[in-house]
Amino acid sequence: MRAPEFQSNTTTSTGCDVCLDPQKSFANLFKRTVILLSGPTGSGKTDVSLRLASMVDGEIISVDSMQVYRGMDIGTAKVSLEDRQRIPHYLIDICHVQELFNAVDFYYQAMHACQNILSRNKVPILVGGSGFYFHTFLSGPPGGPPADREFRDQLALYIQDHGLSFLYENLCQKDPEYARTITKNDKNKIVRALEIIHLTGRKVSEHSWSMEPQESREYNCRGWFLSPPKELLLDNIQLRCQKMLEDNLIGEVRGLLEQGIRENSSASKAIGYREWIEFIDQGSPEEAYEAVKQKFITNTCQYTKKQRTWFKRYPVFRELPTLGLTAETLAGKIAEDYFLHG
């Protein structure tokens, strides 16, 4: 079974300017340039990316593990439909909230989107904060094939009839070494492991995949990481979380619960959703609202620290301080680099 078909939403250079390896320099002459743009949550990636796309005649590929899901709009700060109609976006709103979508699916769909964009002489701009997905794009997919929907549908029926524990026991028999590394309640990993075994005939524990930063073998990547001052970022996050609540984030969560978001452990554990799912499960007590709101803000702030740490490992991403600079100016700096080195 294949991953969902990519959709456009329309309704390696390592970051250094001089490469000391002549073989790499020669190889890069034949690579097409792709722009990578990341930054912590609340750093203004969306605004910069929209302006950048206009400057370089680009189209945007979302690198966000939750924006692939329809209905997860407010909590993921999804780009507006109006902006998506103006500038084509890919890998947004392509899955139902109960569907599993992983790094392998992302890799193949992002590559497909890049080829589509480049075939029309446009510039692919990968934008988002999911470090693991960026790693996958640069280094290749984790061991294993793309998702097989038919097989996953079969597993869903097994879960419905026999429970998740039945699948976990099955995994323990087929790959006890890997089964010991996950919990018996981790539906995503259990399903993915059985899927890999089914499609490849090999145990998950037999697959190897490096988490060391690597250059893209496919493209000449020019990467940027937006870096606002810590105090400013914390202020932005508080305002961002407050606006999400004013925009009816809790109502969005209620709707997603009705659509079965609990069936997707990744989506239901996403920041901005897990806190309010718990709040709703408790009966939405008014006295707990402020505490849950603060937890939402705190979890978001902690996540930005992890994002900074993750991206520091990747020399392809150059830090771009944002203090005192508008989105237009920041986009201009990236565009200038692209026209000089792309």
Curated annotation (Swiss-Prot):
Binding site for ATP: 39-46
EC number: 2.5.1.75
Keyword terms, alphabetized: ATP-binding, Magnesium, Nucleotide-binding, Transferase, tRNA processing
Segments traversing the membrane: none
Secreted keyword on record: no
Superkingdom of source: Bacteria
Positions that bind substrate: 41-46
Annotated segments matching region Interaction with substrate tRNA: 64-67
Function summary: Catalyzes the transfer of a dimethylallyl group onto the adenine at position 37 in tRNAs that read codons beginning with uridine, leading to the formation of N6-(dimethylallyl)adenosine (i(6)A).
Protein name as annotated: tRNA dimethylallyltransferase
